[in-house]
UniProtKB/Swiss-Prot annotation:
Assembly mode: Heterodimer; heterodimerizes with GPER1. Interacts with YIF1B. Interacts with GPR39 and GALR1.
Binding site for serotonin: D116, C120
Similarity section: Belongs to the G-protein coupled receptor 1 family. 5-hydroxytryptamine receptor subfamily. HTR1A sub-subfamily.
Description of how activity is regulated: G-protein coupled receptor activity is regulated by lipids: phosphatidylinositol 4-phosphate increases HTR1A-mediated activity.
Record's protein name: 5-hydroxytryptamine receptor 1A
CDD domains: 7tmA_5-HT1A_vertebrates
Stretches in topological domain Extracellular: 1-38, 99-107, 175-193, 371-378
Compartments reported by the entry: Cell membrane; Cell projection, Dendrite
Covalent S-S links between cysteines: C109-C187
Organism from which the protein derives: Rattus norvegicus (Rat)
Motif NPxxY motif per UniProt: ranges: 396-400
One term under GO cellular component: plasma membrane
Function: G-protein coupled receptor for 5-hydroxytryptamine (serotonin). Also functions as a receptor for various drugs and psychoactive substances. Ligand binding causes a conformation change that triggers signaling via guanine nucleotide-binding proteins (G proteins) and modulates the activity of downstream effectors, such as adenylate cyclase.
Transmembrane feature ranges: 39-59, 74-98, 108-132, 153-174, 194-216, 347-370, 379-403
Length: 422
């Protein structure tokens, strides 16, 4: 969003300078050719990467069937929104930055500001929708499976655009101050105090609060699941120890001492149906695992504990088998929890990046109209803050590509043009 101008011709009055600051502002005649070249290269690279990254996300979801689910529909819609920012907003913002002057007329300025506010607000609200979707999926996983439909995703996406329209349209209908159009060389958003509060809270501060609450509850739910899993493992381990201790003590060897070969450990065979000797075979929780249990030796003879029956009555569960089953179950739970924590971590990084990019901008956007000429903001710092917000549209696809293996594989296929060969 563009709430401040970068330069206003040869005028240097306080009301016309960037951020309403005092002192002289670099005029169009003072802008050097080297500044224009360097700025054009930097901003051109940013815009190109933003377009390419978001286009790849959209193409990946459209071409890769494994990515076509409700959660990724929200991500795809976010990419479309960021693509609109990159194509419709950033080129005009870059031209404004390079020339240090608005040269496209007042009508185009109004359209530029409306598109800027609409697309940037929708992009921010998409992050809210993604956080809300993850919150429902983690806190109500069973019921939300049936509720997580494309229709619900479409409703969330439509809501983000509706709120964006409600925030972007009012200045075009007159909710602005007369000073907003006083300088033909400047193009800034309305500095009306009421609209400033309405737009900044609607586009950023309320969504920020909502995301903080949602992610706080997501982390709390994830932590509860982890602790619950640990308690189950500990309880199962205690039960296994109790069941093992109830087994009859081992018989002594002929010399009255436990034999050196007593209570041998299990021999694990990964191939189902492999012949086993001197032991009892039982298929555990892992369908690909067979346990061979040699229990006790007396002289040259061997005695084997009976395997637990289907009903579990009058049988003893071998400790090694129970430990193996427990390890298998625990490993599966750890894998599931690791995937869940990775998802939460990824979305947390997205939210953190969003805050880093947009918080400085919205602090300035909220404070500036109220402090008038008492605020002092260097023009260069203002431009950096402005483009830091725009860069969020570049960083979103980078984060998804880095953390999501499915997206990585789809991007590789796009680069190698494997989809073209189908």
């Amino acid at each position: 969003m563009d709430v401040f101008s970068f330069g206003q011709g040869n005028n240097t009055t306080a009301s016309q300078e960037p951020f309403g600051t005092g002192g002289n502002v670099t005029s169009i005649s003072d802008v050097t050719f080297s500044y224009q070249v360097i700025t054009s290269l930097l901003l051109g690279t940013l815009i190109f990467c933003a377009v390419l990254g978001n286009a790849c996300v959209v193409a990946a979801i459209a071409l890769e069937r494994s990515l076509q689910n409700v959660a990724n529909y929200l991500i795809g819609s976010l990419a479309v929104t960021d693509l609109m920012v990159s194509v419709l907003v950033l080129p005009m913002a870059a031209l404004y930055q390079v020339l240090n002057k608005w040269t496209l007329g007042q009508v185009t300025c109004d359209l530029f500001i409306a598109l800027d506010v609409l697309c940037c607000t929708s992009s921010i609200l998409h992050l809210c929708a993604i956080a809300l979707d993850r919150y429902w999926a983690i806190t109500d996983p069973i019921d939300y499976v049936n509720k997580r439909t494309p229709r619900r995703a479409a409703a969330l996406i439509s809501l983000t655009w509706l709120i964006g329209f409600l925030i972007s349209i009012p200045p075009m209908l007159g909710w602005r101050t007369p000073e907003d159009r006083s300088d033909p060389d400047a193009c800034t958003i309305s500095k009306d105090h009421g609209y400033t509060i309405y737009s900044t809270f609607g586009a950023f501060y309320i969504p920020l609060l909502l995301m903080l609450v949602l992610y706080g509850r997501i982390f709390r739910a994830a932590r509860f699941r982890i602790r619950k899993t640990v308690r189950k493992v500990e309880k199962k381990g205690a039960g296994t120890s109790l069941g093992t201790s109830s087994a009859p003590p081992p018989k002594k060897s002929l010399n009255g001492q436990p034999g050196s070969g007593d209570w041998r450990r299990c021999a694990e065979n990964r191939a189902v149906g492999t012949p086993c000797t001197n032991g009892a075979v039982r298929q555990g929780d892992d369908e690909a695992t067979l346990e061979v249990i040699e229990v006790h030796r007396v002289g040259n003879s061997k005695e084997h504990l009976p395997l637990p029956s289907e009903s579990g009555s009058n049988s003893y569960a071998p400790a090694c088998l129970e430990r193996k089953n427990e390890r298998n179950a625990e490993a599966k739970r750890k894998m599931a929890l690791a995937r869940e924590r990775k998802t939460v971590k990824t979305l947390g990084i997205i939210m953190g990046t969003f805050i880093l990019c947009w918080l400085p901008f919205f602090i300035v956007a909220l404070v500036l109209p109220f402090c008038e000429s008492s605020c002092h903001m260097p023009a260069l710092l203002g431009a950096i803050i402005n483009w830091l917000g725009y860069s969020n549209s570049l960083l979103n696809p980078v984060i998804y590509a880095y953390f999501n293996k499915d997206f990585q594989n789809a991007f590789k296929k796009i680069i190698k043009c494997k989809f073209c060969r189908r």
